[in-house]
């Protein structure tokens, strides 16, 4: 899928992440920036799991995988990559690398972390977290590389501002909930997934999480009693309307 869009007109990340501006940086126009105001006032992510939802969790578990701990969880990482292949390649028909029934790409490196919701070995949902400071050869992280024109499937104007490179911002990608999860359990799965996402991001020093999600995200977030702001235009990517959003996890409450 090709895009001929131009990223011209993007502004530095500090223009919309005022708390990430270098010490002593003078930006008098900051107070007039509506996006910055929205981000400053964005409530902390505090996933709320209603009792009715908790009752459907059964034996669900949530795990954060890394290259250094995945050996402790048997074939959970392999199962995650196989679940991603079923979702993104088999169902959505994305053109992605695959081998031995697993989907993977250049961002599945030791720099990333993988959030998995699972039950009795079955993968129910997953997210990949990558620091925006990541570098692996010519690649960094998905949104930044897309903005630089390195990813054919994502347009260069995916963000309203220049993609940030800061240890306090992590990117969420490869977000999915298995189609095998029945409707009455999906909110429980989503709740566990987001809860573990925010905990993991915070534990790694992040104050914000940025990512591209289906444009109906606002309805989904409201069901979880969460808040976020759009930081990019709505885009058609592989026949799905998507949009970049931003969470704050700096004040995450357990």
Locate each region found by the language model:
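Acetyl-CoA-dependent GNAT
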Residues: 129-134, 164
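Short acidic N-proximal helix/loop "leader" segments that mark the beginning
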Residues: 2-5, 9-61
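C-terminal helix-cap and adjacent tail motif
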Residues: 246-254
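A structural signal for short, well-ordered beta-strand segments and their strand-loop junctions
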Residues: 116, 123-128, 171, 209-212
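Short amphipathic alpha-helix that is part of the acyltransferase structural core
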Residues: 48-101, 113-124, 131
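Short, solvent-exposed loop/turn elements at beta->coil junctions and helix N-caps
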Residues: 100-106, 232-235
